[in-house]
């Protein structure tokens, strides 16, 4: 937590060069639904849910350089994942789609994994903007289109 606060203060002290930050989660099966849903979201300075969001959180806030000072971010680098390097612009949701079903169930739980696999909900829809995880009944209420598929899903 102290490290993230120090990063935040550094970003704010350099707001002429840094104009925001990106939430970056670890690409593996141990990442929380909260962090997975926020991965790749970009925020202006001093806004958004700043990591560390929970005990043992491994997510980080990556600074985004003001375009005036940007010297090469158009070059797509790599990002670490449990399966080896992936493109730096790969989000957790994109990574999770490529994993086997057991990993998706481990991360999301059985019912959320069904929703994710069906394409009815993206990973970002499992939480609110602050990262609070919606319960299954809340998901059903917030997403009326799920009512048509509720025969195969348990919303209790």
Question: What is each stretch, according to the model?
Answer:
Residues 1-54, 63-156:
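Domain-core detector
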